[in-house]
Amino acid sequence: MNYFLIFLTLLVAVIVEKIEELVAIRFFSSYVLDIARMEAEIEEYKELSMLAMLSGDREAYRGFQDMMNEIYGRVFFRKISFFTPLYFLLLSPYIVALQFLGVENSLSIVLPVAVLYFSAKLFYGMVRDFVKSYVDYRKANN
């Protein structure tokens, strides 16, 4: 039963994430567009800092990195403060349904699985971005 419940919870976590994206775009489109605009700025500063690094201009590189980090901090905390409560608000009917079905400690199963899912997704995104940056750097050096 526990393995089935863990798999079901993982499946529900993925589905709720997709629902969260739809709800955010539908009801909070200006907020989502503002975050997307700031993420585009981060990518622009990332490219500019890479060009500055390749040209040997350390001051420009540090300046672009500082500007990129400042925007990234705002984006990160905006995403965390908005999307995390929205996600768990949308996940709460599943938790309540498990309680009504008689699954004991449903919160202690759902919460770790959801956190583990998002941690793995975040780690994958970080590794993917690192590899992409490394490949871009290697292409620019050759």
Swiss-Prot record:
Cell compartments where the protein resides: Cell membrane
Transmembrane segments: 75-97, 107-124
Membrane-topology annotation of the record: Multi-pass membrane protein
UniProt keyword terms in alphabetical order: Cell membrane, Membrane, Transmembrane, Transmembrane helix
A GO cellular component entry from the record: plasma membrane
Name of protein: Uncharacterized protein AF_2124
Species of origin: Archaeoglobus fulgidus (strain ATCC 49558 / DSM 4304 / JCM 9628 / NBRC 100126 / VC-16)
